[in-house]
Amino acid sequence: MVTTGLILLVAIAILAWGYRRALPYGSVGILAWLQSAVLMAPWLLFFGLFALGIYINLAGVLVLLLGSTGLYIYLGRRLRAIGQATLATSKNATAPETAPESELGISADESEVSGPTDRVTAAPPTAAPGQPTMAIPTEDLAQIEGIFGIDTYFRTETIPYDQGAIFRGNLRGQPAETQAQLSARLRDRLGDRYRLFLVENQEKKPTVVVLPATMDPAKTTPAQWVLALVLAVATFLTGLEAGAILQGFDLIQALSRWPAALPFLVGLLVVLISHEIGHWVLARRYGVRLSPPFLIPTWQIGSFGSLTRFESLLADRRVLFDIALAGPAAGGLVSLTMLLLGLVLSHPGSLFQLPSSFFQGSVLVGTLAKVVLGKALQEPLVDVHPLTIFGWLGLVITALNLMPAGQLDGGRVVQAIYGRKVAGRTTVITLILLALVSLGNPLALYWAALILILQRNLERPCLDDITEPDDARAALGLLALFLALAVLMPLTPSLAGRLGIGG
């Protein structure tokens, strides 16, 4: 109940903040805000009624989701219609053409910042229709246009874009080398005042975008540091509560028994800290600054993990992949090690007893348990070492963060391998699947709501957003996604029967 109330309050606060930001942009801003509100509405209604003890059946949930989807599509069409009308007016004017928001393959609803992450997006035009202006000073623009050449990138058109400019043209060399050469020339002429991005537009053609350095990712503010600290304290408390529930008592009603729940908290922190160390080590290797981790407390398993944003621009998609995968790899290896040690150390009389049917809840865990414990899984109750529980929950936390959605580690991995378009599609598919699974699992409902509210948008493009990671990284990414699926997917009754899992 407390978690539900907190989620509702956070969602309402985000909606109010988004509405305030949208007002200065008129109808375009309001329509973009309404799209976000429509996406959140079914979940807010579901959580609100749930908190009041009213449960919506399957038919009601489907009606809410279908209605929300229909409204979202309608608002998107209205938003595109307004954008096309503005673009047509601009084309007929004597001033330069204003770049549409879709130039970088970024949809209109991504123009707002959701959660603690900044990104490169097109803001609604601030000039009057038909009178677009170039935000870059004329002298600087002339210097920027001078960096292009027939040996790197042959510029054909310059278009105003937010606080910078888009330079359409033809790529004449390898993307990585060209981006490095153009960036070096830009620094030689204008110092560190501008950033050069090489991205694909909607037509899959290389496009150069130059933005002022003032649009770099913002550093963590003192208020955000305080929030990170508050969330860390809350995670300590929920970790203790989850450990208490696991042992059959309520920490709030039996506060003096908190030492009994402490081992669970320690196991949880080992997983979370190893995850963050993985991110930090690779980020340090590439010279990328990270924000402090914003831990996500939950009563069910102690924590969902953490949200960490980039405070530096990323050189290319290889860097995005390495930093994104390093956290789950470190946390997953630690969790898997604890699970295997726990299974090996399990014996009759171990501290915890689990119904053997529990091991049917995960393809990976159930299979490993069968290999190690053998016929013990045919008994109604299975004695297990505490490390088994810690490792299993650590794998669940890692798998949840590897879901291919938005700014989750899995979403970043997919974006790095396949690009923004595919990552956007996998985000929608993930949310739909979570919505269906949540009908029988409240944990999936909470996670879906958090993704929808805080993490649904993609990462901002890399400086070189065209060069793809190598095949080895692509294979590692697919393996990680497969293992995450194996952790979260339950065994079918027939397969569990063939494996001899369940009394």
Label for each model-derived stretch:
Residues 1-503:
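Hydrophobic transmembrane alpha-helices and their immediate loop junctions
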